[in-house]
Amino acid sequence: MSREWIPDFANFRRDGYDFDARWDDGLASYKDKELYETIADEGRMLSKRLKEALNYRKGGNTGFETCITRLQMQSYVCIADFVYMQDKYGRPYGWGVAEYATPEDLFGYDFITSAYQRDPQESKERILKHLQSRLPNATEMQLEKIIKG
């Protein structure tokens, strides 16, 4: 997804809700709220640290992957970077650890919410029209599957 389409994508995937409104309408779970607010308050946070802070470990909270995936699918949270641990010589090793952030933190609140004046369905139609021009052989069902996830 190119930068210019992120506001419409967020508007469509969020169904026109900012996170607080989604919570107020009873459409978000307590665990989602806790994860979202922790990331939003910190700015950026490694998954390892996030799991520790919210007690997602053996004998603690469960469902971290489910909640974080849902928040990503709704475009309230995204992976900002992958950070590699370092050995005693300062060399990176192993798998990268996801660093989560909100799109608002990465791109700015005004930019992310710039499509909020549109109906989410209008944002969807704009994205579909763009994808049809880029992927002329794709069916509408295939394109919808791409943007819905």
Where are these regions (language model features)?
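Long, low-complexity intrinsically disordered regions
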Residues: M1-G149
